[in-house]
């Protein structure tokens, strides 16, 4: 009994360690892979990422690098430039390294 | 020519052979360039795929940002990068790899560029299990073109074996799983495994980036 309890505890600790990283990436990897190969899934992928970003914002956690920009690009490729620019601005605000690239994208989109 | 001379020739010949083998395996012995360059951001460009499996390249591309982001680097958003490169007229990964690094780096203001090439990716169906063998090469280059880090990984992956259950149910499960694996090999676990072997290798540790907790300690004793 005691042994099984400590095993449970250990398993809990281990799984806790496994999920702890610098960031919460949500379903980014599997969803982007689906986005490339299951065109019917695009809407679900976009919605899932936006919900993930909302959850991060609600928790006050910084989203993983690039995720805000990826949401912007999903919208851009759906033809929604306004939503794209909004997300590109958020990526630029969160990550200084992204600013030149985001500025290029925003300038191009606002010129058109 | 005495015995000694013959022995010397043999040794030289052998070392040539050995070094000849080593050349095909791209390796960086020293991290001096890396430490000097101290990149803060990594631009992962589309993956060159020499295999016929079209999902191989996207599975590598989609699993790299997390791997390197968790190392503490700013990783440029791979799908946004891909889209921007396509707007610029660079639609094939090989075309992107042919662009001088300085040009790519300045387009994104990136400190470093990661080039990945899949040399082979084959799934073999043997009775009740499918084994996938991959051979992937990774090269991290500074904005000025200096090679900072490189590795090449060959590995095999099979669906998990089932140790519990009767022989028949195990066999049935394996057949079903193998059929699934054949229709759609388990791309993401395999590429995660390959990436992890490359970037969390204790013998060739990949240095931490500026957002990693150990960054300052790591660079404290570096020139």
Which residues make up each language-model segment?
Chain A
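Bacterial Sec signal peptide processing site at the extreme N-terminus
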Residues: 11-34
């Amino acid at each position: 009994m005691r042994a099984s309890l400590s095993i449970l505890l250990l398993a809990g600790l281990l799984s806790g360690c496994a999920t702890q990283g610098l960031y919460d990436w949500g379903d980014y990897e599997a969803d982007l892979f689906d986005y490339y190969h299951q065109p019917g899934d695009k809407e679900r992928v976009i919605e899932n990422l936006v919900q993930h970003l909302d959850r991060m914002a609600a928790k006050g956690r910084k989203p993983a690098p690039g995720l805000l920009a990826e949401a912007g690009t999903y919208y851009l490729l759906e033809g929604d430039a306004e939503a794209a620019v909004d997300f590109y601005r958020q990526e630029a605000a969160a990550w200084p390294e992204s600013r030149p690239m985001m500025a290029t994208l925003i300038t191009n989109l606002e010129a058109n | 020519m005495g015995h000694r001379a013959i022995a010397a020739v043999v040794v030289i010949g052998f070392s040539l052979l050995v070094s000849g083998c080593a050349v095909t395996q791209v390796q960086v012995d020293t991290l001096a360039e890396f430490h000097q360059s101290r990149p803060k951001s990594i631009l992962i460009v589309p993956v060159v795929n020499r295999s016929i499996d079209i999902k191989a390249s996207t599975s590598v591309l989609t699993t790299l940002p997390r791997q390197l982001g968790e190392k503490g680097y700013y990783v440029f958003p791979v799908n946004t990068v891909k889209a921007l490169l396509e707007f610029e007229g660079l639609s094939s990964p090989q075309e992107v790899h042919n662009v001088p690094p300085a040009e790519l780096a300045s387009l994104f203001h990136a400190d470093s560029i990661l080039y990945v090439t899949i040399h082979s990716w084959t799934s073999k169906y043997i009775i009740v299990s499918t084994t996938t063998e991959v051979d992937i090469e990774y090269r991290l280059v500074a904005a000025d073109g200096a090679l900072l880090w490189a590795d090449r990984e060959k590995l095999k992956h099979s669906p998990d074996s089932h140790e519990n259950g009767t022989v028949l149910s195990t066999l049935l499960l394996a057949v079903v799983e193998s059929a699934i694996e054949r229709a759609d090999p388990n791309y993401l676990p395999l590429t995660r495994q390959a990436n992890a072997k490359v970037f969390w290798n204790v013998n060739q540790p990949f240095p931490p980036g500026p957002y990693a907790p150990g960054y300052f300690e790591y660079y404290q004793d570096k020139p």
